[in-house]
Amino acid sequence: MTALPQRTLMVMAGGTGGHVFPGLAVAHLMQAWGWKVVWLGNPAGMEATLVPKHGIPMEYVRFGGLRGKGMKTKLMLPVNLLRACTQSLSVLRRVKPDVVLGMGGYITFPAGLMTALSGRPLVLHEQNSIAGLANKVLAKVAKRVLVAFPNALPHGEWTGNPIREELARAIAPKARYAQRSGPLNVLVVGGSLGAAALNEVVPRAVALLAPNERPRIVHQAGAKHIEALRENYSAAGLQAGADVELVPFIDDMTSAYANADLVICRSGAMTVSEISAVGVAAFFVPFPYAVDDHQTTNAAFLADNGAALVVQQRDLSAETLADWLRSQTRETLAEMAERSRSLAKPDATEQVAQICATVAGSISGASPEGKQ
């Protein structure tokens, strides 16, 4: 019997982890199904360093955004866009992908346009609750439009965000919370850049609580901010120890989420999706300068369903947080966690991969050997 030719997926994604990591989740699954995967990114983006470490070959297109740039960059847009389109077309002719998956980042725009104009099928995935201009345009020429949050794009199919497999396999919240006793376990996530508002307010809020009201804290703040965070806790009369753990990084986020009764954090798209997948109560403080304020609408997806609380940074204070923590019990947080888990899309990675396979003309992609 003649073996079927190996099919090729090209992933277009770059710029931030919110675009790259969900793309990697789909890429690895497609590889497990026997597909060849090629990644199109920007040589100056994080993907240029990260993706090759995952054994995925790279192709490059140079293209950047206009937000915050000077007049010279804006005047050069037509030239830069034309160059990026030419580079994208060259890559498409060389790679000959059976399907192209656009996961976001500036390079997705010229490469997505050239994908559609060259007659190759484009699958578009929007990770945020509010789509950017590029995806709004590309959605008009894509074969399938997928969204992580309902109604992010017209006619978008709600798949959720592709996440790491271990997050989707976390033990159900009801079982986790029922096994615990004693002080609440609170995880504070500032991210690699640190979230100054959280680093300043959380220590003061905990200090306002009576000793018997204080939760156990695991506070992640990024390597550059860990000493300042230590000083913040010290100034609040709290020392790092058994009940206050300060860490620059967390390698195993699945365990960190699963061990927490409550997560206090920003509300980037992947953070919201991961918290929902694991099923844990959340206190969101959206980044106030996010494009189109998309972090607020990301968080609202869970908050509107009783799975989280959203407090804007301008309204956040030690007193507000302390009062809210006093009002919570492990039982109330467990209820929030259950609601959060019920909104998750744990099969998002497989669903996105299956759609790519279908668009490429496969009967079924769900085969580790890639047999159709």
From Swiss-Prot:
It is found in: Cell inner membrane. It comes from the Bacteria. Its EC number is 2.4.1.227. The keyword Coiled coil does not apply. It is a peripheral membrane protein. InterPro entries: GlcNAc_MurG, Glyco_trans_28_C, GlycoTrans_28_N. SUPFAM superfamilies: UDP-Glycosyltransferase/glycogen phosphorylase. It catalyses: di-trans,octa-cis-undecaprenyl diphospho-N-acetyl-alpha-D-muramoyl-L-alanyl-D-glutamyl-meso-2,6-diaminopimeloyl-D-alanyl-D-alanine + UDP-N-acetyl-alpha-D-glucosamine = di-trans,octa-cis-undecaprenyl diphospho-[N-acetyl-alpha-D-glucosaminyl-(1->4)]-N-acetyl-alpha-D-muramoyl-L-alanyl-D-glutamyl-meso-2,6-diaminopimeloyl-D-alanyl-D-alanine + UDP + H(+). Keywords: Cell cycle, Cell division, Cell inner membrane, Cell membrane, Cell shape, Cell wall biogenesis/degradation, Glycosyltransferase, Membrane, Peptidoglycan synthesis, Transferase. One of its GO terms (biological process) is peptidoglycan biosynthetic process. Pathway: Cell wall biogenesis; peptidoglycan biosynthesis. It is an enzyme of class 2 (transferase). One of its GO terms (molecular function) is undecaprenyldiphospho-muramoylpentapeptide beta-N-acetylglucosaminyltransferase activity. UDP-N-acetyl-alpha-D-glucosamine binds at residues 16-18, 128, 164, 192, 250, 295. Cell wall formation. Catalyzes the transfer of a GlcNAc subunit on undecaprenyl-pyrophosphoryl-MurNAc-pentapeptide (lipid intermediate I) to form undecaprenyl-pyrophosphoryl-MurNAc-(pentapeptide)GlcNAc (lipid intermediate II). Belongs to the glycosyltransferase 28 family. MurG subfamily. This is UDP-N-acetylglucosamine--N-acetylmuramyl-(pentapeptide) pyrophosphoryl-undecaprenol N-acetylglucosamine transferase. It comes from Paraburkholderia phytofirmans (strain DSM 17436 / LMG 22146 / PsJN). The lineage of its organism: Bacteria, Pseudomonadati, Pseudomonadota, Betaproteobacteria, Burkholderiales. The gene is murG.
